[in-house]
Design a protein with these regions (language model features):
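Noncatalytic alpha-helical scaffold of FAD-dependent oxidoreductases
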Residues: 1-414
């Protein structure tokens, strides 16, 4: 049975297939296309909107064993990997080469899954999202056709951008099997800082000025007082208080990292920031960011026996969040149907408010099952019709991850 932490409805596939190569995926899809069998791709199972849930049964196509790093081009700063390679596995391989792949959603996702959901992470403010860091793809279409998109170059002005079409398609247009990624050199120095405020407004105003000032912050995250209280207890951050908090990371030379931190401290002080603590030791930096990545478990531990629903939206940074504007919420509630209904209603209110502010229904979690109802409001009927036409053209029998993104997409029995 497949379900995730925030989508309690479980569905069982009729079979699970473990793929090891693009050719195996192509053979499977050719067969499934001919016999109208649904196929739902599975990577590490870390998605939060029900993407890997096989709502119509069929095949759960597990790509986790397609985990080979195929080629690293040090001089060109790019790498080719199979879809089942995880982010930590890749960076572990690259470390001794002085290179790294920057997109960091927190969970140890597969690269294929990160492409499928158009993932980003805590350092998107400097390095961008998967959209900016994927150079090319190999994918298998619904009928088994193998297609290559993009390449190894940083830009191209030829033809439609099929790479960006597949990134964020959540396995509904094709199964991504290989990815060409952009790499970066490991910075000479890294520093982290934490600063606490008496108000959310002070923290947000600080970030707006930091970004407008051109300070090249590598990561920047805002944590509210309630989450800080949970993280202090869970991650033993005894020197911290339960206050609105900004977390920073700076990359560059030793001199530039120190200068960035000094500039950020001066700005935060002007907005009521206090106790700006700067650290360059790896142990201190890692502890700080691990606490951020453990926020989900900290929140759960703060309310034993409660269920949790996590959601994300994105808004302009002036409207209340920082960095790239991604806004994450964890809703904790008693494990009863009535409380669950209230949690879902609150989620809808949050998304509606984000759209009213010029934002989007999701910044990085994707659409899956949970955000389908908001696509028309966010994109409009003509754009939604274009999406539907693309889906019908590439997957006319609706076998690829049916029920996801579009409410009225073709189904496998159509």
């Amino acid at each position: 049975m497949l379900q995730d932490q925030t989508n309690p409805t479980a569905h069982e596939p009729d079979a699970v297939v473990f793929a090891h190569s693009t050719e195996e995926v192509a053979a499977l899809l050719k067969h499934c296309h001919a016999h109208h069998i649904p196929v739902t791709a599975f990577g590490a199972g870390t998605s939060l909107e029900g993407h890997v849930t096989p709502v119509q049964g069929g095949i759960s196509l597990d790509l986790s064993q397609m985990n080979q790093i195929l080629a690293v081009h040090d001089a060109d700063l790019d790498v080719r990997v199979q879809a089942g390679v995880t982010r930590r596995q890749l960076n572990g391989e690259l470390r001794d080469r002085g290179l790294f792949f920057p997109v960091d959603p927190g969970a140890d996702c597969t690269i294929g899954g990160m492409c499928a959901t158009r993932a980003s992470g805590t350092n998107a403010v400097r390095y961008g999202t998967m959209r900016e860091n994927v150079l090319g793809l190999r994918a298998v279409l619904a009928d088994g056709t193998i297609v290559d998109t993009g390449g190894r170059v940083r830009k191209s002005s030829t033809g439609y951008d099929l790479t960006r079409l597949l990134i964020g398609s959540e396995g509904t247009l094709g199964i991504i099997t290989e990815i060409q990624l952009r790499l970066f050199g490991v910075p000479e120095a890294t520093g982290a800082a934490i600063c606490q405020f008496t108000s959310v407004a002070g923290a947000v105003s600080s970030v707006i000025e930091i970004i407008q000032s051109g300070i090249p912050v590598a990561r920047i995250e805002f944590v509210d007082a309630a989450q800080m209280a949970a993280s202090i207890a869970y991650s033993k951050l005894t020197a911290m208080q339960a206050l609105p908090t900004l977390l920073f990371e700076f990359h560059g030379s030793e001199a530039s990292v120190a200068e960035q931190a000094q500039q950020a401290e001066a700005i935060t002080t002007g907005y009521g920031g206090a106790a700006f603590a700067f650290a360059t030791a790896a142990e201190d930096r890692n502890r700080l960011w691990q606490a951020r990545h453990d926020a989900f478990w900290a929140a759960r531990a703060s309310r034993p026996g409660y269920a949790v629903f996590t959601t994300d939206t994105i808004v302009p940074i002036s409207r209340g969040h920082v960095g790239d504007g991604n806004f994450h919420v964890m809703i904790l509630f008693p494990d009863t149907p009535e409380a669950a209904a209230r949690a879902w209603a609150l989620d809808r209110e949050i998304v509606a408010q984000a759209l009213d502010l010029g934002g989007a229904a999701s910044g990085e979690h994707g659409v899956g099952l949970g955000k389908r109802e908001f696509l028309r409001r966010e994109h409009g009927a003509p754009a939604l019709a274009m999406m539907r036409a693309i889906k019908t053209a590439l997957d006319p029998r609706g076998i690829l991850n049916p029920g996801k993104i579009l409410l009225d997409a073709p189904t496998s029995d159509g």
